[in-house]
A protein has these predicted regions:
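N-terminal basic/disordered segments at the start of proteins
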Residues: 1-20
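A structural micro-motif recognizing beta-strand termini
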Residues: 5, 331, 337-344, 356
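Active-site beta->alpha loop and helix N-cap motifs at the rims of alpha/beta catalytic domains
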Residues: 9, 39-100, 105-110
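Conserved, mostly hydrophobic/aromatic
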Residues: 13, 92, 123, 165, ...
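Glycine-rich, proline-tolerant flexible connector loops at the mouths of alpha/beta enzymes
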Residues: 22-41, 61-67, 250-254
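Catalytic alpha/beta core domains of metabolic enzymes, predominantly
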Residues: 107-242, 256-259
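Anionic-ligand-binding alpha/beta catalytic cores of soluble enzymes and soluble regulatory domains
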Residues: 140-143, 249-321
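Conserved small/polar residues in nucleotide/adenosyl-binding loops
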Residues: 368-375
Length: 379
């Protein structure tokens, strides 16, 4: 499941062959501040685009819902139903209940922190797909999957519940993303989609009694590394995970395309019996080229304490530099015209071209000539 926070990322998800995408509109989603691109008027277009490419479309309505939000929530869920959105992703029972009332499919968010089969049985009345708590290890996931099969725990469709888990991307320092630090420090609630990323800053630790600053080995003491599971995708599949969710609605289209392609290839390799160390190493190198804060395994393999990044921002092995913008595309000959206005281009440079219909295209500069009258780049 690919994260989509812009039309460029939607096009990139299509290019990468994603089976589904998830996105938010305006308010009432957990990326309302950082990925606020789409509106309620875009729902039909997004649903139609996904249908044309054989993808499912999932709309996040996963914030805390207050009484004053109920009319807006009804409007959004009604619009999703009318537009043909595949499902809404919910964390509040008010959203789940209303969606079921009008016949809109529901998926359950990790914000619910579902950690056992008994809780799953309760929520099964609302949804066929459930994101389990991200703090679970794979043994715990496998136990829940075993009970789903043995006790035939089904959702509204009558089919057995499918387990969805995050496989890649940023992790919140708080349990299942329920963070109050941003609200406390900046008066912007992460649980209302307005996280100010306070945890990503560097900090000093000082003893209040002695005023002595403690010597710590990492000043980014609340900023987790990014999750990466591609090297043990086989174990996740064996544990019963059936939907793999990639975090990153606020990240660029090149991130979406690269990460989706790598994980799709990994799942295919597992199914074909060609999931090898050599392929894992190649996927790792590709994943390092796009935005990341360093990587760790999350809690899936039994680790109980998080691993913290040592960088502010991205630790990607490749750095993007804005060079110029597209001017015109000549569709009859497949040639694009670009205005190079911000940086020089050299033969051998890796070029990234993005756009609402372009998605993310990676090319290499094979020819570059420049004179007073004209610049010509060949790729």
């Amino acid at each position: 499941m690919a994260p989509v926070g812009s039309r460029e990322s939607l096009a990139a998800a299509i290019q990468a062959g994603a089976d589904s995408i998830y996105f938010g509109i305006e308010n009432l989603n957990m990326r309302a501040r950082s990925a606020n691109t789409f509106t309620i008027d875009d729902l039909r277009e997004i649903a139609r685009t996904c249908d044309e490419h054989g993808m499912k479309s999932y709309l996040t309505v996963n914030t805390i819902i207050y009484d004053k939000d109920i009319p807006l929530m009804h409007t959004i869920v009604d619009a999703a139903k009318e537009a043909g959105i595949s499902a809404v992703i919910a964390a509040d029972v008010a959203v789940m209940n209303y969606a079921r009332q009008i016949g809109q499919e529901v998926h359950l968010s990790t914000q619910l922190n579902i950690s056992n089969a008994e809780a799953l049985k309760f929520y099964a009345q609302f949804a066929d797909v459930v994101v389990l708590a991200r703090e679970l290890n794979l043994e715990q996931v496998a136990e829940i999957y075993r009970q789903i099969q043995e006790e035939h725990i089904c959702g509204p469709s009558g089919e057995q519940i499918r387990i969805e888990m995050f496989c890649h991307g940023a992790l919140c320092m708080a349990v299942s993303g329920k963070c109050y630090l941003s609200l406390h420090e900046m008066n912007h609630s992460a649980n209302r989609g307005a996280c100010m990323q306070v945890c990503r800053r560097s900090y000093t630790v000082r003893d209040k009694e002695t005023d002595v600053e403690l010597d710590i080995d990492n000043e980014y003491i609340m900023s987790p590394k990014d999750l990466k599971t591609i090297h043990f995708m086989n174990k996740m599949l064996d544990a019963g995970v059936r939907v793999f969710k990639i975090e990153g609605r606020a990240r660029g289209p090149e991130y979406v395309r690269t990460v989706v392609e790598c994980y799709k290839e990994a799942i295919k390799a597992y199914l074909e019996g060609t999931f090898t160390d050599e392929k894992i190493a190649a996927w790792d190198e590709r994943l390092k080229t796009v935005f990341n804060r360093g990587f760790w395994d999350g809690y899936y393999l039994g680790q109980r304490l998080g691993e913290w990044t040592r960088n502010y921002g991205s630790a990607a092995t490749e750095r993007k530099i804005y060079v110029g913008k597209g001017i015109k595309y000549f569709s009859n000959i497949g040639v694009s015209e670009f205005l190079v206005e911000a940086a020089e281009v050299s033969v051998g440079d890796k070029l990234l071209i993005t756009g609402p219909t372009t998605g993310a295209l990676f090319m290499t500069c094979l020819l570059y000539t420049s004179d007073a009258a004209d610049d010509l780049i060949g790729v």
